[in-house]
Amino acid sequence: MRYILLLLIISFGCSPVFAENRAMKDMCNRLFPEHSGNFTFELAPDSLENDFFTIESINDKIKISGNNNNSLATGLNHYLKYYCHTHVSWYATDKIEMPRQLPVLLDKITIFAKCKTRFFLNYCTFGYSMPYWKWKDWERLIDWMALNGVNTPLAITGQEAIWYDVWKEMGLKDQEIRSYFTGPAHLPWHRMSNVDYWQSPLPLSWLKNQRKLQKQIVDRERLLGMTPVLPAFSGHVPAELKRLYPDAAITQMSQWGGYDEKYRS
C-alpha cells in the first residue's frame, strides 16, 4: 500500500499539468509579480481541432483554461488587453501598468484560434538589435510571443557555433572559419548567402555565448507550447573548402548589395 501511495505521489508531482501550470505562474511572476496570485491556470483536454482558451472569474481569482500553455498565455493576454487595458511590449525595459484591483468577468468566455500554425520572425529581424540581446531580452520577447499566440517562432540564434564545429572537423583553421562569418549585425545576410567576411573575424567568445543563449531560447519556447523553427543546411560553404577539396563543385555566389568582390564565397 505504501509503495502504491509513493508511486501516486511521484506521478502527480511529475505530471504535465503541474509543469504547465508552473510555467504560466512563472510568466506572471516575471510580468506582474504583485498580481501573480490572482490567476489560476488549468489545462483542458486537447480534444478539439483548434487551440482555445476560456476565461472566468471564480472566488476572486481569474481562472484561465486552455488546451496547452500557448493557449493559456494567449488567454492571459486577452484578459490583460481587453479587461485590464494593459499593454505588454516585447522590450524587457518597458514597465507593465496593471490596475490595483483586477476586473471581474460577469460571464465565462471561450475563444478559438483561427489557424493552427502561427509563425513569427524572419531572417533579417535577427540582424537589428537581436545580435546584442541578453537572456532577459529574449525572455521578454518569448513571453510576448506566447501572449500573442505565436507557436512557430523562427529560432536561428547561435547557428554559427555549429557551423564552426563542422568546418573545423572538415579541416579548416580557426581563423579561416571565423573570418568567413560576418560581424554579428550582418549575420542574417551571411546566412542567406549574400555576404561573407564583412566585419570579421567573429569572436570565439561570441560564438560560445550564442550557443548557450540558443539553448535557453528553444527550451523556453517549447515550455510555452511553441515549436521552434530551426535552420538547416542551405548549401552555403566557405571558399576555403576548395583548398581541402579541390575536386568539389563549389560555385561562387554573385555580388550582392554593392559589396566588393572579396566579400563573397
Task: Specify the residue positions occupied by each region the protein language model found.
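Bacterial Sec-dependent N-terminal signal peptides
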Residues: 1-21
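Short amphipathic alpha-helical segments
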Residues: 20-23, 137
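Mature N-terminal segment immediately following signal peptide/propeptide cleavage
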Residues: 24-36
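Aromatic-lined carbohydrate-binding surfaces of glycoside hydrolases
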Residues: 35, 42-49, 54-65, 69-70, ...
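Conserved short beta-strand edge segments in small beta-sheet-based binding/regulatory domains
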Residues: 86-90
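Compact, glycine/acidic-enriched structural inserts
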Residues: 97-101
